[in-house]
Amino acid sequence: MATSGANGPGSATASASNPRKFSEKIALQKQRQAEETAAFEEVMMDIGSTRLQAQKLRLAYTRSSHYGGSLPNVNQIGCGLAEFQSPLHSPLDSSRSTRHHGLVERVQRDARRMVSPLRRYPRHIDSSPYSPAYLSPPPESGWRRMMPWGNLPAEKGQLFRLPSALNRTSSDSALHTSVMNPNPQDTYPGPTPPSVLPSRRGGGFLDGEMDAKVPAIEENVVDDKHLLKPWDAKKLSSSSSRPRSCEVPGINIFPSPDQPANVPVLPPAMNTGGSLPDLTNLHFPPPLPTPLDPEETVYPSLSGGNSTTNLTHTMTHLGISGGLGLGPSYDVPGLHSPLSHPSLQSSLSNPNLQASLSSPQPQLQGSHSHPSLPASSLAHHALPTTSLGHPSLSAPALSSSSSSSSTSSPVLSAPPYPASTPGASPRHRRVPLSPLSLPAGPADARRSQQQLPKQFSPTMSPTLSSITQGVPLDTSKLPTDQRLPPYPYSPPSLVIPTHPPTPKSLQQLPSQACLVQPSGGQPPGRQPHYGALYPPGSSGHGQQPYHRPINDFSLGNLEQFNMESPSTSLVLDPPAFSEGPGFLGSEGSMSGPQDPHVLNHQNLTHCSRHGSGPNIILTGDSSPGFSKEIAAALAGVPGFEVSASGLELGLGLEDELRMEPLGLEGLTMLSDPCALLPDPAVEDSFRSDRLQ
C-alpha cells in the first residue's frame, strides 16, 4: 500500500512536472484553433463570394432575358427592379411600362454601372413592329432616365441641363449622334414625305422613317409632340413619343401600301441588336410578271409548253392572231416555208387582191388534185392581206399559216379594210404585233426553216413554232404517212374583229367580229368565194357597206377551203354564220348601233358552244395613238423595222411596220412576256378582259 501510495502521487508529480507534454497540448490546441480559424475564414470567404456571385447572377439573369432574344420573365423582372430604382426613376416607370402595354419593365441601373467598358450597349431599339421589348436589349438608365416620358414639367427643365457627356457614355448610338449631329438644337421635324433616294438630312430614308442624323438627347427633351416614331407604321397613329437618340439607321419599313415596287427595299445597314425587320410591308417584285388577264390565270406566259391553249391565248393577249389549231404532239420534220413564191410580192403591191388570188395561183382551184404543189397558197394571201402592218385589223395574220399542215386551224382571216379609207377613225388604227417571219427568197426560207425548231420552247413542235411565226408550212413534200391526219372534231373557233370603213360604223361597231369555224370531213368541190378579201379602192367594190362580208359569211359563200388532200378540206361551218341571235345578229343589226361589250359577249358565248379547242377572241378597241405606241415599243425589238415608206398598200399611216425575218434574239425577246409590253398603256390596250 505504501508503495502504491508512494507511487500514486509520484506519478502525478512526474506528469505535472513534465513541461513537454503541456507545450505539446498547447501547440495542439493552437493548431486546432488555427485550423478552425482558417476553415472559418474560408467558409466566410465562400459565403462572401457566393453572395457576390448571386448578385452578379441575378444581374446577369435580368440582362440575359433581354439579350438572349427570349421572352423575359415579367414577374422576376418586376421583383428585381426594387434594388436598382432611384428616386429619379420612379415617376418615369409607370409611363414607361404603359408604353409597352404593361408587359415588360425595363431594367434600370444608375450611371455608375454604365461606365463599365464590358457593358454591351443596345444597337437598335423600338424600330421593329414586333413589340421590340422582347427582342432588343434594354435601354440604359444613364441616358434614358434623362428624358421625361410623361408630361413632367417639373423635371424637364432640370433634366434638360444635365451634361451631355454623362448621357453620351451610355449608348453607342451616342457615337453616331456626336459624329452626325453638329446642331443639337433643331427638333425632329416629324415624318417627312417619302423620297426615293436616302438623304442624310431632311429627306429621310426611303419613306422618311427616320432622320439619319440621329440628333442629340437634348433636342428630344424639348417637345414630346415632336417625338413621334415614324418608322413604326403600326404605332404611328397612337402618337406615342419615342426618343431617336438611341436609333441607328438600319431597318426601312414602308408604311405606305402603294409604295412603288422598284424602289430598293434593302436596308442600308443591317441591325445587330436582335430586332427583326417587318417583311410584311416590303414590296418585293414577283419573280414572274403578273398575268395579262387577272381572270385567265390559266394562260400565264408565252412559253406555254405543248399546250396550244396557252400559246393561243397568250398570242391573243399580245395582239397576235392565233391561227392555231395544230395539236402539240405532231412533230413534223422537214417542214418548208414556200414564201419565195413571186406572187407574194405581187400580192403585196397589187391592191386588187382578188385578182392576185385568182390569176397567178393554180393551187387554190385544184390543190386537192395537185398534191405536189405547195398547199399554203391560202396562207400566201391571208398573210399579205391581214398581217403585214395592216393598221385597221386587230388580228394580224397568223391565221392561215397552218393551213397547209393542219386542217384544224382556222384559216380565214377577216377581210381587210385599210385605215386609209376616207374618214377612218385613227382610234382603230392597230398595227399588228404578230411575230411574222416573211423571208423573200429561197435562202431566207431555208434559214427560217432551220431556225424555227430552235426558237420556241423545246416542247413545241416545229409546226407549232412556224405557226406562231406566221410562216406557212408546206407538208406536200413529206411522205403521206407523215402528213397530219384530218381532225374528226370541231377545231378552235376564231373570232377576228375587223373594222368597217365608214366613220359612223367605226364609232358604232368597234368590235364587230366574224366568227370562222372550220370543220373537217366535208367533201371539197367549190372554190372559196373571196368577195370579202379585197381592200376598198379595188375593182368596183371599193365603198361597199361593211355588212356585205358578214352577209357573205352568213350565206355560206366562203364555205370551203381546198387543201392538199380531198379528205382534209377545211369547211366553214354555215351554222356558225347563221343570222340568229347566237351570232352577232342579223344583217340589219350589223350596221346598226350595238354595244361592243354586248357584241364581244355574244362572241364569247357563241365561241364557247363550238368545238373543243380554245376560243380566240380579239377585240377591236384600241386607245388613240395606239399604233405609234406599238411602233415605239417594237422599235427596240430586233427584226422589226419601222419604215416610213410602208407596205405599198396605200395605208394612211406614217408609222408602218415592216416585218423582217425574226432572228433568235428577237424570238427570245418575243418569248419574254415583258419584252413587248414596255409600258402599262400598251399593256392595257392588249387586254381582252374588258368584255365585262
Swiss-Prot record:
Q: Where is this site: Required for ubiquitination and degradation?
A: 628
List-wise, which residues carry Phosphoserine?
A: 70, 86, 90, 136, 171, 275, 307, 369, 394, 434, 457, 490, 493, 612, 622-623
Q: List membrane-spanning regions.
A: none
- Any one GO CC term of the record: cytoplasm
What residues bear Phosphothreonine in this entry? 169, 192, 502
Q: Which GO terms describe its biological process?
A: gluconeogenesis; glucose homeostasis; positive regulation of CREB transcription factor activity; positive regulation of transcription by RNA polymerase II; protein homotetramerization
- Cross-link entry Glycyl lysine isopeptide (Lys-Gly) (interchain with G-Cter in SUMO2), positions: 235
Which residues does this entry mark as bearing Phosphotyrosine?
Answer: 489
Taken from the UniProt record, the cysteine pairs bridged by disulfide bonds within this chain are none
UniProt xrefs under Pfam families: TORC_C (PF12886), TORC_M (PF12885), TORC_N (PF12884)
Region (Required for interaction with COP1) spans which residues?
Answer: 209-215
Which positions does the record annotate as the modified residue N-acetylalanine? 2
| Compositionally biased region (Low complexity) | 336-384, 391-412
Mostly located where? cytoplasm
Q: Where is this motif: Nuclear export signal?
A: 272-288
Q: Which domain of life is it from?
A: Eukaryota
Subcellular location(s): the record lists:
Cytoplasm; Nucleus
- Could you say which protein family the record assigns here? Belongs to the TORC family.
Q: How does it assemble?
A: Binds, as a tetramer, through its N-terminal region, with the bZIP domain of CREB1. 'Arg-314' in the bZIP domain of CREB1 is essential for this interaction. Interaction, via its C-terminal, with TAF4, enhances recruitment of TAF4 to CREB1. Interacts with SIK2. Interacts with 14-3-3 proteins, YWHAB and YWHAG. Interacts (probably when phosphorylated at Ser-171) with YWHAE. Interacts with calmodulin-dependent catalytic subunit PPP3CA/calcineurin A. Interaction with COP1 mediates nuclear export and degradation of CRTC2.
Q: Identify this protein by name.
A: CREB-regulated transcription coactivator 2
Q: Species name for this entry?
A: Mus musculus
